[in-house]
Curated annotation (Swiss-Prot):
PROSITE patterns linked: CRAL_TRIO (PS50191)
Record Pfam families: CRAL_TRIO
Organism field: Arabidopsis thaliana
Function: Required for transport of secretory proteins from the Golgi complex. Catalyzes the transfer of phosphatidylinositol and phosphatidylcholine between membranes in vitro.
Name this protein carries in UniProt: Phosphatidylinositol/phosphatidylcholine transfer protein SFH13
Lineage: Eukaryota, Viridiplantae, Streptophyta, Embryophyta, Tracheophyta
Length: 625
């Protein structure tokens, strides 16, 4: 029995030992599994950090805004033709490449492309000289509060169609006191600044609120109390300069104008004088209303959007200055302004209808990323390729950036398409879809060829081992299995360390470049190290100066050879001006004679009245005597 007991105790010992070994194996496996999970998490974090570094994702999860956009087919074709011509002449900056901006200028010249091009060139020249593009940031109108005391004005609400309402109380304007506070030049800069603010803030905000395209304003001029005292030479110069800016540089931004509280004197004397500063199109948009006709404003503007002095029901405080200081409107809504300016991108869904066919409608999406996101994305992309200038990945990135820039230039060269905020996402047919797939495959093949060319070039360069190891690392990481991830990653890192150890420092510092022309001519060719720049000689320095002197001499000869005589058109203008002066002198002489005759007649009447009074007094004296 003792032998049996020994066998049983031996079996128990083996079972305990096997249980202990099994538990140890499980612990090891669990530890290995935890290590694998940690390695996978670390690798995913590392790759995600690299992806985030290379590009930033833009979150478009904002509420889509549907904006109706009604277009005329004829106007649209003229706009496309005008845009193509501007692109050919390099006269279309990106900030002005917008359908409704081009249409406004075309309407100002009756859809005449030649005349509109001249107006457009003048506008671009003026914006560059005046600094209009940065006037919102550069110009500070410090005297605004004092100016508004002597020239009450401001935006207040919207009309029934969603356009912003601009109000001026001309009857309470004092030009002489205004010029003591500011100057004409500073006030004109403030005028331009308000126009730019309307284009960049008020019109987009009203478009989002009204869900239709808003590109113009409704203006109300209150002329109650306006008289000759308000029409000084300074006021005339200011009005002329403002009308020049409005008509030439911001055309077709006025939808309609109402001159309210106009008396008989204004209609007969002041209104005819004011028409001399306006063009025919602007005059056709102006409606003159008497004090009894203020109710006509309610046909186009709701009473809640009108101040009390114009027959409305609004009596907002407006920072102590009444309705004109309140700046009431959709542009004060933080949610709307967040869509326009803030960090979130805005997604506008535009629906287009043609006037010729009311049943036709097409919708398209226009994405407007914010300026902050654009700057952040561009900065991240620039960092991703330029962090390590001596690394081969940086070289490959530079080669691919050359291809991307070439692709962008090829896409931008298509002037027949309209690539602005109004690009249509229409449903293509089979033929166009096939063409699009072919183009996409061509672009993909170009990028693939560029990558292979970059690899070929790098293999012939001195730092080829580094590129090969990094390429192998990328391929192996894609194909590797989870259970061997930590082991293989460690071995690859050791191999990389050995390569860096035995590779000379000069080979690491050498850089290669891939020229874009080699991508299109021959895939087997690649440009290696660029030759050092040649030092400029004395001849190279003198040659540009000689060319400039020759140009100056040529221009001087052209100016000298010009005829001294006055051109025929200017001579006609001078003759017409002389004729007008003569006619005015004749009218003045005639008026002078009439005034003289009137004075003489008045003196005769006065003398006759005096004689009659004397005779009556003489008769009374006789009666009393």
């Amino acid at each position: 029995m003792s032998g049996v007991e020994e066998i049983s105790t031996l079996d128990e010992f083996r079972e305990r030992r096997s249980d202990f070994e099994i538990s140890e194996d499980e612990r090891r496996r669990s530890k290995i599994g935890n290590l694998k999970k940690k390695a996978i998490n670390a690798s995913t974090k590392f790759t995600h950090s690299l992806k985030k570094r290379g590009k930033r994702k833009i979150d478009y999860r904002v509420p889509a805004v549907s904006i109706e956009d009604v277009r005329d087919e004829k106007e649209e074709s003229v706009v496309l033709e005008f845009r193509r011509k501007l692109l050919e002449r390099d006269l279309l900056p990106p900030r002005h490449d917008e359908y409704h901006t081009l249409l406004r200028f075309l309407k100002a010249r009756d859809l005449n492309i030649e005349k509109t091009t001249q107006l457009w060139e003048e506008m671009l020249r003026w914006r560059k000289e005046y600094g209009t593009d940065t006037i919102l940031e550069d110009f500070d109108f410090e005297e605004l509060e004092e100016v508004l005391q002597y020239y009450p004005q401001g935006y207040h609400g919207v009309d029934k169609e969603g356009r912003p309402v601009y109000i001026e109380r001309l009857g309470k304007a004092h030009p002489s006191k205004l010029m003591r506070i500011t100057t004409i030049d500073r006030y004109l800069k403030y005028h331009v600044q308000e126009f730019e603010r309307a284009l960049q803030e008020k019109f987009p905000a009203c478009s989002i609120a009204a869900k239709r395209r808003i590109c113009s304003t409704t203006t109300i001029l209150d002329v109650q109390g306006l008289g000759i005292k308000n029409f000084t030479p300074t006021a005339a110069n200011l009005v002329a300069a403002m009308s020049k800016i409005d008509n030439s540089y911001y055309p077709e931004t006025l939808h309609r104008m109402y001159i309210v509280n106009a008396g008989t004197g204004f209609k007969k004397m002041l209104w005819p004088a004011a028409q001399k500063f306006l063009d025919a199109k602007t005059i056709a948009k102006i409606h003159v209303l008497e004090p009894k006709s203020l109710f006509k404003l309610h046909e186009v503007i709701d009473s809640s959007q009108l101040p009390e002095f114009l027959g409305g029901s609004c009596s907002c405080f407006g920072d102590g200055g009444g309705c004109l200081r309140s700046n009431k409107g959709p542009w004060n809504d933080p949610e709307i302004m967040k869509l326009i300016y803030h960090g979130e991108s805005s997604l506008f869904r535009q629906s287009t209808r043609k006037l010729t066919d009311p049943h036709y409608s097409s919708s398209y999406i226009s994405i407007h990323p914010s300026k902050a996101i654009q700057a952040e994305t561009s900065a991240a992309e620039s960092i991703s390729c330029s962090d390590v200038p001596s690394s081969p990945t940086g070289r490959l990135c530079s080669a691919s950036s050359h291809v991307n820039s070439a692709y962008e230039e090829a896409r931008a060269s298509d002037v027949n398409g309209y690539y602005s905020c109004d690009d249509k996402f229409a449903i293509p047919d089979k033929a166009t879809n096939r063409k699009g797939q072919e183009r996409q495959s061509q672009y993909q093949m170009r990028e693939l060829n560029a990558t292979t060319i970059g690899l070929k070039c790098e293999t012939s360069s001195p730092g080829a081992p580094i590129i090969r190891w990094l390429h192998d690392l990328r391929v192996m990481i894609d194909k590797i299995k989870c259970e061997n991830l930590a082991k293989r990653l460690l071995s690859l890192m050791l191999k990389l360390a050995a390569v860096f150890r035995y590779t000379p420092l000069e080979l690491l510092r050498s850089q290669t470049t891939v020229s874009p022309s080699s991508l299109t001519e021959d895939d087997s060719r690649c440009s290696l190290i660029s030759p050092p720049p040649r030092e400029p000689t004395m001849k190279d320095r003198i040659l540009p100066c000689l060319e400039r002197i020759q140009k100056l001499e040529k221009s001087y000869e052209d100016i000298r050879n010009k005829p001294v005589a006055i051109p025929v058109e200017k001579e006609r203008m001078l003759m017409d001006s002389l004729d007008r002066i003569k006619s005015v002198e004749f009218d003045l002489d005639k008026t002078k004679r009439l005034l003289h005759a009137t004075v003489m007649k008045q003196m005769e009447i006065t003398e006759m009245l005096q004689n009659i009074r004397d005779s009556q007094l003489h008769r009374r004296r006789r009666l009393f005597c």
